[in-house]
Amino acid sequence: MRGGGLICALVVGALVAAVASAAPAAPAAPRASGGVAATVAANGGPASRPPPVPSPATTKARKRKTKKPPKRPEATPPPDANATVAAGHATLRAHLREIKVENADAQFYVCPPPTGATVVQFEQPRRCPTRPEGQNYTEGIAVVFKENIAPYKFKATMYYKDVTVSQVWFGHRYSQFMGIFEDRAPVPFEEVIDKINAKGVCRSTAKYVRNNMETTAFHRDDHETDMELKPAKVATRTSRGWHTTDLKYNPSRVEAFHRYGTTVNCIVEEVDARSVYPYDEFVLATGDFVYMSPFYGYREGSHTEHTSYAADRFKQVDGFYARDLTTKARATSPTTRNLLTTPKFTVAWDWVPKRPAVCTMTKWQEVDEMLRAEYGGSFRFSSDAISTTFTTNLTQYSLSRVDLGDCIGRDAREAIDRMFARKYNATHIKVGQPQYYLATGGFLIAYQPLLSNTLAELYVREYMREQDRKPRNATPAPLREAPSANASVERIKTTSSIEFARLQFTYNHIQRHVNDMLGRIAVAWCELQNHELTLWNEARKLNPNAIASATVGRRVSARMLGDVMAVSTCVPVAPDNVIVQNSMRVSSRPGTCYSRPLVSFRYEDQGPLIEGQLGENNELRLTRDALEPCTVGHRRYFIFGGGYVYFEEYAYSHQLSRADVTTVSTFIDLNITMLEDHEFVPLEVYTRHEIKDSGLLDYTEVQRRNQLHDLRFADIDTVIRADANAAMFAGLCAFFEGMGDLGRAVGKVVMGVVGGVVSAVSGVSSFMSNPFGALAVGLLVLAGLVAAFFAFRYVLQLQRNPMKALYPLTTKELKTSDPGGVGGEGEEGAEGGGFDEAKLAEAREMIRYMALVSAMERTEHKARKKGTSALLSSKVTNMVLRKRNKARYSPLHNEDEAGDEDEL
């Protein structure tokens, strides 16, 4: 189809050329391919209205989707020249209309020549702004304080007596507890001072009040004595303890009866105590609360501190020397001791004044590089070391407003002096005293401004010059008084998270970078505008229309009137009402051509047709005075609507879109510095240990102490079993104990003997319970019976024949001797082996005296038992018997003795 149109265009071009050669004033016909222009009459006028040029909006659409036009039949040779030219004009108009429809959004403007009614001038160069930066940058070192959430800790001593009353029922071989009553009683002040601390002993009784009645408990149900305190078996890392007894006292054993036993264990225990702000109470490590301030006392106005107890329950002792109950050593320095008795215990602790002992703020961070910058109505303290930014007011914060803040100034000065001596001593000097600011979030900043030595010398020189320039008699300006601090005090609350300061630091970091970048861009932009203003002033002389339109922001026409420009507003013309002609040659002047294409347009759709010339950038000029000599090889591209029209040899060739022409950018790339990387480090306001330790009660420590109490102050390994002899031994022991030292000595012997007997009996009993033991005992009993039988026979024999029983061998010899030799054969026998009657009589007399001696001894023994009178009576009786019973025998001769001696 495009080939057929091209042939038609060539035919039309040939005919137009022939007409032009016949009439010299007629312009040459262009070659129509793709886009065509309206034909021009031989006399230079338009032969017909050309079709509109396509708009640029549809150019890309046509490139994306190429729509083939309907196929037309090939043109047949025209019968004559006029018919061929008419057909070519119709084809050109149709093609131009199609182009106009595609580029309907292109706008044309008619700019009338300015008359000078409106004149404008260029603005003078502006003063470029400066970059927005922080003011009063100051370098220095800082100490950041936070709220002190740690409790006040101190050592305390508890004095109490554990009272245990047990009810036991005893069986024969077992015992059963019927009830156990346990209570805790406080130790009186006098006993604490005079007994425990002075001698290391404690009374065995406990006097305390229950149900508003005073009661007394006696240890072991006995009279009151002093018991020595001994160290506890188990000691913790943070405390020690002492007590008087390990074992619980059980009552004496009486079978089938209920008995009661009382145990009083005096305990002295060192514990940790803690108190939190406002220090109105404290709690012990055992979990016991004391509703009194640890700083309460009678010295230095401490009586105004809080207490919930009566005055007689509290006592303060000056010059108190504590004693170590383990080593019995006495402290070298005295203290002021507070004593408080409660219904359950007595507690003692060393009194100290409140003001220097506690502080509501504590040091958090020491920053050796802190930058202070003023932004608006606030200071911003930034540190790269901790990656945080703190925001404060411009006014300083008075330390007198901080409740219990005496440590702030002292700790701040010490830390600042230490950091300055370590890092800045040789290069900087301190400027004034430390300044204090309250930052958002409850952080108190102690800031010490620093100044380098070089700047300090410059400031000193400048100050000296100013002093030299002042008149000598000038009076110094009065110093401004510092604003008075608020008399009321407050406690600074610090947030537990520092994330807001980290975000503030990030925001300031980004803000500083962006503001720096935008500031540089603003300065560069301003300077560029000032530089371009010179170029605009020169360019307006060359093309005032373009300069004025670019400056005003809309299409205007302009011309120079000296140093000012006269401008007039351009009238827009719809693209459908503009027609471009196909020839740029001047028909009436051979060799002269138009430098820009000719156009015909209407202001309105039905308005009259106006002839003009296409200006720059779709401007429609009302005149056709843009001429130039015709040249060979002429090629031009002109903006027409949304695209370009191409003329070759001053004749229309074709139309193309702006996308078909390579674009050369006149913009300069802006090189912007990228934001540098910044790494955040973990930063905690309060550590896990500080948060755990911030509470008033440490439940772990309380549970540990409660479960360790029995292990420390009681013997859990000794077992007392049911024993029937325990009552007997207890009675004997009590009996001998009441007899004094001698009784106790005798009691030890007796108890040993009784213990041996009981042990022997117990051994026999256990031996009998064994089968082999029972058999052995049976054999022993049988042997004993046999021995008793023989002994009984011997006694009977002794009664019947004593001599035979006593002298069995002698009587046996007498029986076996010759019977004739005894008293036979007259006198010889009498003289020889017969019985001597005198000797028999003597033997009887001896037996009688032996019986008499036995009777006298028995009588005297009985008289000794009866008394002195009986003894005298016995003596008299013996004397009488001796006088009555004189000897009735004559002395024996010594013949036998002499004979015996001769035989020897």
Curated annotation (Swiss-Prot):
Full protein name: Envelope glycoprotein B
Segments on the Intravirion face: 793-904
User: What is the organism field in this record?
Assistant: Human herpesvirus 2 (strain 333) (HHV-2)
Q: Which UniProt keywords apply?
A: Disulfide bond, Glycoprotein, Host cell membrane, Host endosome, Host Golgi apparatus, Host membrane, Host-virus interaction, Membrane, Signal, Transmembrane, Transmembrane helix, Viral attachment to host cell, Viral envelope protein, Virion, Virus entry into host cell
Disulfide pairings = 111-570, 128-526, 202-266, 359-407, 593-630
One GO term under biological process is: symbiont entry into host cell
What is the documented function of this protein? Answer: Envelope glycoprotein that forms spikes at the surface of virion envelope. Essential for the initial attachment to heparan sulfate moieties of the host cell surface proteoglycans. Involved in fusion of viral and cellular membranes leading to virus entry into the host cell. Following initial binding to its host receptors, membrane fusion is mediated by the fusion machinery composed at least of gB and the heterodimer gH/gL. May be involved in the fusion between the virion envelope and the outer nuclear membrane during virion egress.
Family the UniProt entry places it in = Belongs to the herpesviridae glycoprotein B family.
User: Where is this protein found?
Assistant: Virion membrane; Host cell membrane; Host endosome membrane; Host Golgi apparatus membrane
Q: Where is this region: Disordered?
A: 40-83, 467-490, 816-835, 883-904
Which stretches are tagged as biased composition: Basic residues? 60-70
Motif extent (Golgi targeting): 849-852
Signal sequence region = 1-22
Q: Which gene encodes it?
A: gB
Topological domain ranges for the Virion surface compartment? 23-771
